Curated annotation (Swiss-Prot):
Transmembrane segments: none annotated. GO terms for molecular function: cytokine activity; enzyme binding; granulocyte colony-stimulating factor receptor binding; growth factor activity. Glycans are attached at residue 166. It comes from the Eukaryota. Granulocyte/macrophage colony-stimulating factors are cytokines that act in hematopoiesis by controlling the production, differentiation, and function of 2 related white cell populations of the blood, the granulocytes and the monocytes-macrophages. This CSF induces granulocytes. GO terms for biological process: cellular response to cytokine stimulus; cellular response to lipopolysaccharide; cytokine-mediated signaling pathway; granulocyte colony-stimulating factor signaling pathway; granulocyte differentiation; immune response; positive regulation of actin filament polymerization; positive regulation of cell population proliferation. Belongs to the IL-6 superfamily. It is found in: Secreted. It holds the Pfam family GCSF. Disulfide bonds join 69-75, 97-107. O-glycan consists of Gal-GalNAc disaccharide which can be modified with up to two sialic acid residues (done in recombinantly expressed G-CSF from CHO cells). This is Granulocyte colony-stimulating factor. SMART domains: IL6.
Length: 207
């Protein structure tokens, strides 16, 4: 029977492919895009920079978590996706952004709501492991900063609601395994969300 070192690359690839397939609907929503908006260029460039930073942080967390799952056989790909459903780990929609008629107010609102959601999901992963703690903390801060940037722009445009949203119920992880498996799914969902966000923002930043 092959050992962990032999099975690790195959399991890692299978897990990444399965997670990518489960995220495909989000990426498919990214076409086509409507005409560019009149959002300030400085705001859009700042957002693009923040997205790239979060993508780097998220990729680092995702790589460590997926590698652990593959190496120590903690997460079978199909079981991991089923666990995500049972734990109620949600997706953040961006349906108002990549469409023929871009809804600017709705898009900014969904960007902010999505970031706020992932901020809560990342907070739910606290205590996942001492090794991953610093990476998780950095990721939380960067997501919170990006959400603040979006909210401030909404306020400047008069699009912000009277009150900021409150965090809903987050998944409850009953074991260290569930927390690590949930971490893989949260990181994957966040990366898919950021891919679409980046594409939309880059389009809007075009002259």
């Amino acid at each position: 029977m092959a050992g962990p070192a032999t099975q690790s690359p195959m399991k890692l690839m299978a897990l990444q492919l399965l997670l990518w397939h489960s995220a495909l609907w989000t990426v498919q929503e990214a076409t086509p895009l409507g005409p560019a908006s009149s959002l300030p260029q400085s705001f859009l460039l700042k957002c693009l920079e923040q997205v790239r930073k979060i993508q780097g942080d998220g990729a680092a967390l995702q790589e460590k978590l997926v590698s652990e799952c593959a190496t120590y056989k903690l997460c079978h790909p199909e079981e991991l996706v089923l666990l995500g459903h049972s734990l109620g780990i949600p997706w953040a929609p961006l349906s108002s952004c990549p469409s023929q008629a871009l809804q600017l107010a709705g898009c900014l609102s969904q960007l902010h709501s999505g970031l706020f959601l992932y901020q809560g999901l990342l907070q739910a992963l606290e205590g996942i492991s001492p090794e991953l703690g610093p990476t998780l903390d950095t990721l939380q801060l960067d997501v919170a900063d990006f959400a603040t940037t979006i909210w401030q722009q909404m306020e400047e445009l008069g699009m912000a609601p009277a009150l900021q949203p409150t965090q809903g119920a987050m998944p409850a992880f009953a074991s260290a395994f569930q927390r690590r498996a949930g971490g893989v799914l949260v990181a994957s969902h966040l990366q898919s969300f950021l891919e679409v966000s980046y594409r939309v923002l880059r389009h809007l930043a075009q002259p």
